[in-house]
Amino acid sequence: MADLQTQMKQAVALAATDQVKNGMVLGLGSGSTAALMIQEVGARLRDGRLTDIVGVTTSFQGEVLAAELGIPLQSLNAIDRIDLAIDGADEVDPAFELIKGGGACHVQEKLVARRAERFVVVVDSTKLVERLNLGFLLPVEVLAGAWRQVQAELQQLGGSAELRMAQRKAGPVVTDQGNLVLDVSFAGGINDPAGLETTINNIPGVLENGLFVGLADQVLVGEINDGVAGVRDLVKS
């Protein structure tokens, strides 16, 4: 039997997939919960419950999975619209502000989220926080030749920034765009996500950071009640 966290992820992935309609251009997110959603979309295409779906992926990993499942794919440049994007998050606060980028895919994730007519975030209840960055580091994608300079400027903003190192190769993590990632912690968390998102992105050498502000239209939360997995439609505050 799946553990409780997996059950929560499965429940919320199914609930999100129920919003997918025939003929949609669908933003396919990254991460473990989004992967379950992609698998369900593939299953519904195979058995005819869904037809004429076109996917736009947010990571190479998601592209591989979707292709294996037979989901037709297009690049972001090849489509005029995204009807619905479904993606996970590493942290979600009560105002639907997010930190994403644990998988170093936040640049493409943000591009897809901004293009989407509707952006639905799928998380399990462990991802809900009162303030961002108290438990999860903020990813900042930087040009390889500028990471030390950006690190210094982030420190001037009060952040502690470390270069993300790879787990199964020597050296740093390299993003799908060929850049590096600084993981940043701010003492006391982030009290102004919108302002900090803009400030960081204005640092020369920064491509994008993992703060997603004003993008999420809905947050679906997988949770366990009385031992049974269910889904809550989070109310924005």
Swiss-Prot record:
InterPro entries, per the entry: NagB/RpiA_transferase-like, Ribose5P_isomerase_typA_subgr, Ribose5P_isomerase_type_A
Record field: catalytic activity: aldehydo-D-ribose 5-phosphate = D-ribulose 5-phosphate
GO cellular component, one term: cytosol
Keyword ATP-binding: no
Pfam families referenced in this protein's UniProt entry, alphabetically: Rib_5-P_isom_A
Keyword rRNA-binding attached: no
UniProt GO molecular function: ribose-5-phosphate isomerase activity
Sorted UniProt keywords: Isomerase
Catalytic residues of the enzyme: 109 (proton acceptor)
Pathway in which the depicted protein is active: Carbohydrate degradation; pentose phosphate pathway; D-ribose 5-phosphate from D-ribulose 5-phosphate (non-oxidative stage): step 1/1
Binding-site positions, substrate: 30-33, 87-90, 100-103, 127
EC number, UniProt record: 5.3.1.6
GO term, biological process aspect, one: pentose-phosphate shunt, non-oxidative branch
Subunit structure and binding partners: Homodimer.
Physiological role: Catalyzes the reversible conversion of ribose-5-phosphate to ribulose 5-phosphate.
Similarity section: Belongs to the ribose 5-phosphate isomerase family.
NCBIfam families for the chain: PRK00702.1 (NF001924), rpiA (TIGR00021)
Protein's name according to its UniProt entry: Ribose-5-phosphate isomerase A
